[in-house]
């Protein structure tokens, strides 16, 4: 089945839609957007790149940052917001001349299923290797992404090697979390983790103590085992809990004011209003090998709750 275009929205709604719960609508990118909704909240997912564009729990502020309305971005451009799917490479570790963060975020995904109950609304998307993906990465694969809205937002990515040779993968979910002010945030769950700092003059591995108060540009790359984190947003008085599986690293990133190359993407002060907390496998030993027929699962669940004092920050 070919990847759907805007003209396919009516057929998608007949086959996979449910009024008020699962609705496909056109976009200016000639690739539909699916809206998932229920009593707990709503989310929008673009079929181009399988990128979650928004997530809003009922009665609460949006959880995800998007610098510009989706329909105002150039067709095929990188969307620096929402939750990009980074696969089969993370950051700039792909082949020479390749795009940032892999091929999955630049491809049109198919819809293969949907379901809903009183408490959960879910859509299943799929992407297979083809002549276009082979131009950037010459391997056969199949990806399946399930996005569901319940009391939390959940993304579950399964990657399968459908070829005859093993390949190496780095991957990640790259959520941009909306915050009132970057300098009023901190990340819990990294105490005791070994980490590297992309901007530090010393490049060795060190051990982190306490929570991470986000105050500067760059990335902290944590080696994680617990895989339970909390982004405390003291400006909005809320906590965003992130639980993941299948990742060996956690990247906490913000471009900062000094990153001039990011101004076009985020606007003059957009950097102040998001923090990325990214469950991933980075371009070091944290990647994994997939033999023919093997699969790997990466999962992330996000829940936004008021900061009522039940979640306590631990400063260094």
Walk through the language-model features, giving the residues of each.
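Beta-strand-rich interaction surfaces with strong enrichment in secreted/lumenal proteins
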Residues: 74, 144-146, 285-290
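Extended, loop-rich substrate-binding clefts of extracytoplasmic carbohydrate-active enzymes
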Residues: 23-28, 98-150
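Short, well-ordered beta-strand segments enriched in hydrophobic/aromatic residues
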Residues: 43-45, 147, 153-161
């Amino acid at each position: 089945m070919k990847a759907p275009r805007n003209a396919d929205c009516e057929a998608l709604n007949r086959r996979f839609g449910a009024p008020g719960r699962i609705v496909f609508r056109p976009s200016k990118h000639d690739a539909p957007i699916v809206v998932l909704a229920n009593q707990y909240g709503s989310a929008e997912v673009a079929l181009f790149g399988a990128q979650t564009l928004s997530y809003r729990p009922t009665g609460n502020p949006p959880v995800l940052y998007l610098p510009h309305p989706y329909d105002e971005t150039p067709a095929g451009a990188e969307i620096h917001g929402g939750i990009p799917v980074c696969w089969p490479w993370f950051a700039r570790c792909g082949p020479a001349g390749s795009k940032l963060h892999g091929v999955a975020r630049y491809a049109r995904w198919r819809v293969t299923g949907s379901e809903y109950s009183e408490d959960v609304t879910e859509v299943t998307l799929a992407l297979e290797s083809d002549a276009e993906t082979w131009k950037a990465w010459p391997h056969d694969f199949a990806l399946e992404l399930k996005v569901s809205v319940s009391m939390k937002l959940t993304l579950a990515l399964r990657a399968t090697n459908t070829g005859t040779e093993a390949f190496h993968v780095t991957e990640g979910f790259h959520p941009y979390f909306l915050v009132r002010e970057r300098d009023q945030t901190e990340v819990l769950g990294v105490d005791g983790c070994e980490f590297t700092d992309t901007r530090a003059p010393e490049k060795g591995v060190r051990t982190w103590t306490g929570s991470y108060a986000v105050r500067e540009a760059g990335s902290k790359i944590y080696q994680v085992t617990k895989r339970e984190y909390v982004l405390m947003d003291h400006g909005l008085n809320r906590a965003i809990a992130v639980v993941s599986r299948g990742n060996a690293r956690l990247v906490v990133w913000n471009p900062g004011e000094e990153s001039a190359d990011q101004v076009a993407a985020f606007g003059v002060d957009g950097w102040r209003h998001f923090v990325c907390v990214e469950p991933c496998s980075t371009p070091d030993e944290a990647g994994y090998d997939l033999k023919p027929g093997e699969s790997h699962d990466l999962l992330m669940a996000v829940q936004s709750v008021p900061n009522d004092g039940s979640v306590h920050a631990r400063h260094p």
